[in-house]
Amino acid sequence: MKINNYIIRRKSKKIYIKNVPIGGDSPISVQSMTNTCTTDINSTISQINKLQKAGADIVRVSIPTLEAAESFKIIKRNVSIPIVADIHFDYRIALKAAEYGADCLRINPGNIGKLNRIISVVSTAKEKKLPIRIGVNSGSLEKDIENKYGINNPKSLFESAMRHVNILEKLNFDMFKVSVKSSDVLTCVQSYKLLASKIDQPLHLGITESGSMLHGSIKSSIGIGLLLSEGIGDTLRVSLAADPIEEVKVGFSILRSLNIRKRGINFIACPTCSRQEFDVINVVNVLEKRLEDVITPMNVSVIGCMVNGLGEANRADIGISGSRNKSILFENGLRNNNKINNEEIIDKLEKYIRKKVKILNLKNNC
């Protein structure tokens, strides 16, 4: 399937996590994961709702104990977004999560246990019509595979995934997606490429334990971006040691940068130099914060001088090009007769952007 003029998407089977389609011709979905203690029910519900408001399509919740599974039961009743139950070590927790309304089960081949336990989980998933995610991670590989290939080897992640893909296929279960995550970008990318060439199940993209807000965003953007640019990937999570809401923002920014899926404002801003006629950095940072609630796709250019300001403004929905004392406003590439006083750019530009959002929304709803 052709996504745009540059990307042809890999053909994959379509599955559903509640009402969200994954794979096939579905939009590439953005996921995040709660970092609250699951037994803190109110905090977990609150964070799930915030993630949904931020644009997450799916939220994953860790269930480390049977006690947490009881909390999950209450949490699930009080949220509407699709929830993936994240299960490690104890297969009984997966059975409980399925009973309590999970929309998908994530199991880790490296620690879920023997074949009979996997069969039990798959049997329950079949009964409940629940999809499963086979979530392979370089930090928790099966010991025999780790000894065979080592940790940061694409073949180790691939073999672990295929071992469990084969098990699920033998059990006539095809409602599953797969991830092969490593904290090493190139290992991760090559693992996904191996997997994409072998199976047609949906692939969940991510760089595991990628790091802080800054470095994790960079690593995830490179790794996930490389795969998406080759048409690989059906859903993604940007893993950051940061507020999970930032994961959603970065995820959509990656998709927007590749013209795969657009949500919210794409700010085009110059890095600034001595030619700038107003404080570009402050203007962009303040506007990004003020306009976080905008989900309508649009391009806004904020350029501090006339060198590139006119050209960028010509291609934007709303653009400002720096000029002495008063800067030039553009809408749909056309110069607006009203210049904006440089001291008032933030407030005036926000006003014009929100007005444009209303116009675009009316147009889209016609």
Swiss-Prot record:
Pathway: Isoprenoid biosynthesis; isopentenyl diphosphate biosynthesis via DXP pathway; isopentenyl diphosphate from 1-deoxy-D-xylulose 5-phosphate: step 5/6. HAMAP family: IspG. Its cofactor is [4Fe-4S] cluster. The lineage of its organism: Bacteria, Pseudomonadati, Pseudomonadota, Gammaproteobacteria, Enterobacterales. It catalyses: (2E)-4-hydroxy-3-methylbut-2-enyl diphosphate + oxidized [flavodoxin] + H2O + 2 H(+) = 2-C-methyl-D-erythritol 2,4-cyclic diphosphate + reduced [flavodoxin]. GO terms for molecular function: 4 iron, 4 sulfur cluster binding; 4-hydroxy-3-methylbut-2-en-1-yl diphosphate synthase activity (ferredoxin); 4-hydroxy-3-methylbut-2-enyl-diphosphate synthase activity (flavodoxin); iron ion binding. Pfam families: GcpE. The gene is ispG. InterPro entries: Dihydropteroate_synth-like_sf, IspG_bac, IspG_bac-typ, NO2/SO3_Rdtase_4Fe4S_sf. It is an enzyme of class 1 (oxidoreductase). Binds 1 [4Fe-4S] cluster. It comes from the Bacteria. [4Fe-4S] cluster binds at residues 270, 273, 305, 312. Belongs to the IspG family. GO terms for biological process: isopentenyl diphosphate biosynthetic process, methylerythritol 4-phosphate pathway; terpenoid biosynthetic process. Keywords: 4Fe-4S, Iron, Iron-sulfur, Isoprene biosynthesis, Metal-binding, Oxidoreductase. This is 4-hydroxy-3-methylbut-2-en-1-yl diphosphate synthase (flavodoxin).
